Amino acid sequence: MSRGIIVLDAGHGQFGNRYPLLENTFEGTQNFKLAMRLKAELEARGFAVLLTRNSIEDDPSLEERGKLAGDNHAALFLSIHSNAPGAASSPEAYHAVRGSEVYYSLADEPRNAEIARALNDAVVTTMNTTDRGIKTRSYPDQPGINYYGVLRHSAAYGCPTAFIIEHGFHTNPEDAAFLSNDECLQRLAVAEAEVIDKVL
């Protein structure tokens, strides 16, 4: 018997956001690879897992991604990403930024911050990267409404336990090297599955 449904959202599409320091490497592809590994680890622990991208070519809308969690009464929605900085003073400064951060839904779920912290701690430790903390973001004129579409739509369709993990910066040489390595992605999958196994 399933312990509950987890929805994994591999962010972007196959060729979304090229790694600037590596040839033929894209955030959307690496997100999908990590999601597939995490799916296997969660299923081994008794969870049922649904993917917003069932093939690497898929690129559903933000609403479709969040709606999948609500429609299936998911216990947890996890959107898998890596990060890139905004404007920087120099190329060196741009590539120097690194670290993990987790955004959690503003929906009325008291354990969201606790789960976000556990997920972020696992990523920071596994990647040996900077801890950029756990965060929320709302619209400036609409406090309490999630800024990020997948969190907003997952809450609107009935899944308040929702997170975005920014697994380091694919613009940083150390983080990018980790995220482009299949063995390292497997280590991340195990670490994140262990957290979900404990909190649900």
Task: Specify the residue positions occupied by each region the protein language model found.
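Catalytic-core regions of hydrolytic enzymes
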Residues: 2-114
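Active-site-adjacent mobile loop/cap segments within catalytic or ligand-binding domains
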Residues: 4-7, 18, 72, 79-87, ...
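Long, well-ordered alpha-helical scaffolding segments within enzyme catalytic domains
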Residues: 33-37, 43, 114-126, 177-200
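Short, well-ordered coil/turn elements that cap or connect secondary structure elements
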Residues: 44, 97, 129, 157-159
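Hydrophobic anchor at the start of a short beta-strand
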Residues: 48-50, 131-132, 162
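Short alpha-helical interface elements
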Residues: 63-67, 74, 108, 127, ...
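Active-site-adjacent substrate-binding region
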Residues: 112-142
